[in-house]
Structure formats: C-alpha cells, structure tokens
Amino acid sequence: MRSVVRLTASATSALPRWLLLAISIVYASFGLFGRDPWKNEDAAGFGVMWTMAKGNAHDWLFPNLVGKYLTDNGPLGYWLGASSIRALAPWVDASNASRVFTGLLFCGACAFVWYTAYLLGRRAEVQPFKYAFGGEPEPRDYGRTLADGALLILLACFGLAERGHETTPQLVQFVCIAMLVYGLVRMIDKPIQGALIWGLAIGLVTLASSPVLVAALLLGTLAMTLIVRETRSRWLLLAGLPVALVLAVSWPIIALAAFPDDAVWYLNQWLHVSLSSFAGPPGSVAAYALKNLPLFTWPAWPLALWSWFSWKGLRRAPHVAIPLSVIGPLFVLVVLQSQQSNRLYMLLLPPLAVFATFALPTLKRGAINAIDWFALLSFTILGSFVWLDRKSVV
C-alpha cells in the first residue's frame, strides 16, 4: 500500500533525551510534594498507606482506613506508598514520602509510552514515502520523532494534571496499562520478552485494580492477537499467562493462609464491588462522561480520531490495532460505570497518546502550527487556573 506520509529527513529532528527526561521529571514533581491532599480520594489513599505503614500484617493484606475496609481496588498501590513511608520515615514526613512512588510511577509510564511509539514508528508499514532520489528519514529517526510526539501528547492531556499527582491506586493502574501496551508491541520482534512484560502488566494490574478491569484487558488484548498476524505468538500463553496468574493469585493465597475468614469476606467484597461498579449507566453517568471525557483526554482524542481516518487502509496493522485493543475495552467500562467518576479516564491516556502520535505526520504543516499555538494558549490558561486555585486553598 502507498504510504500516507510525506516527510523529509529534515522534518524529523528528535528532541534531546535529556530534555524529554527533564520535562517528565518536572511535570511529575510539580505540585506533588509540600501540599495537603487535594480531595477525598487523595486523602483516603494516603490514609490507607499510613495505616499500613504503622500497622501489622492484617493491615497490609486488607487495605483499610483506620478499620474501614476499602475493597474497590487491590492492595498494590497502597503497598508501594506504605513501603515508601517506612523507608523514608527518618528523613521525610509521611505525606511527602507516600508520593515518592507516585513520581517514579509517572516517569515509568512516560518511558513505556515513549518506547512503545518508538518501536511502532520503526516498522515498515508506517514509514514515509520513499522519494526517487532519497531524502526520506531513516526508520530510527522517524521512530524517535513519533515517540517524542507520543510523550508530549500524553503530558499535554488536561486530565493528567489532576489525576497524575494523587496518592491513589489509579497511578499504579496507569503505569501497568502503559506497560501492557509496550509488552504487546515488544512481542512482535522479541516474543518471549514481550509476552513476559505483558504477563507482568496483567498480574500487577490485578493486584492494583479490580477483576472486571483485568477481564476486559485480557479479552481485548487476546482478541487482538487473533486479528493481528504480527502479534500471534504461543509465548503469550506459554510465558505471559503463567506469569500473570502467579502474580494475580499471590495476594489471595497469602491472605487466605494467614487470615482465612477475613480473606474470604474481603475477596468476596472485592469481587462484588467490582461487578456492581459496572452495572450499566444511568442517564446522569452517560451525561457526565459525554461532558468530561473529551476535556479529560484533550488533545489526545481528536488526534487519535484523525489517526483512525488517516490510516484507514492499515487498521489491522500493529500501530492501529494494539492501542485500540486497550482503548476499546476501557471505553466500554467507562460507558458501563454505575457512578459518576473519572477514575478510568486516566487509564485511556497511554494507548490514546500512542495512537494519536501517528496522526502527526499525516497533518499539514499549518495544522501542526495551529495545534502548537492552541496547546501553548491552553496550557497558559490552565496553569493560571491551577495556580490560582491552589493559592486560594492555601
């Protein structure tokens, strides 16, 4: 098929690695430390971590806030925060210590998004049109340009400024989603390594979230491997699934061995809350999603939509099918939520950013310049509002 991209080598200059790293660290650190919790979920997350850090084995196995059990997510996110509180207790206060892993996880997610787009951007089917006398970019340089775009699109999303700095389990889920997408892409050229990364991501997201979310991700990604020839590998079943299973059952087995009665009750509640959270949308929930999801995922979603139409002849190619295999199940869960919440919205951002970056080389230069100016204006206005809001709280 004839390439839809017309680019020269001079148009694909990549950003320095140190600059991307600095941008990610500054974004992750800004507003993370030296503050009180922003809202109830942030405060509750810290409270559970503090209870674990000061408590016993029972508190670590069954997340609770001073005796009130939280059964909507697994314990992994709380474990990381509590471990950080304990490790840094002599030097850093508990509130700031609990957020150290938040910053590290955020930077990890950024790295997964960058490398995912980089690997996809080097593939033959996405390369620019080859001119008769040369001048097109090398696959490596083109891949780096697309990877830079994916990372910047991710950091530009409005919703990330709110959810990306909280002490909640959603950030662990966020990095696991980014890892899962990376594992699927890595599996194309390194099947065993990619399958192991995918299995690790599925296992960790099980420990950090809910059974329904895990089931949706499993169905979406396994169905995609049946459609996309490049991702078919026996190692997904022979290596990936066993790793996922071992990690997923580790917490329930330990809990059942240590506190059988409490574990049975807690695990039943964990499953019940997971199922009841996706019982179908009342009208108010659908209206909430229609109003807030486009703003939360801006500017990734319009670029992803443009990418869908631009690559209409290659919709079974990995750079289209792999992100959509995660976006699709997550979007279904967003629609089926029983209560108004934007918790799941952040999980859409890693695959959306990867998919959206493939719209950039298909846009005309004028459109790209307009996007740059709009992004600058939006960030200025949004940053001013966030700063004023924080000043008013203080």
Tell where the protein language model's regions lie, with residue ranges:
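Extracytosolic helix-loop segments that constitute the early lumenal/periplasmic catalytic or substrate-binding loops
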Residues: 27, 45-69, 76, 83-86
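Loop-to-helix entry region of an early transmembrane alpha helix in multi-pass inner-membrane enzymes
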Residues: 79, 88-111, 116, 143-148, ...
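Membrane-interface transmembrane helices that cradle and orient dolichyl/undecaprenyl
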Residues: 141, 145, 162, 180-197, ...
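Specific aromatic-rich, kink-prone transmembrane helix
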Residues: 159, 172-189, 351-355
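Short acidic/glycine- and proline-prone juxtamembrane loop motifs at membrane-interface regions
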Residues: 159-172, 211-213
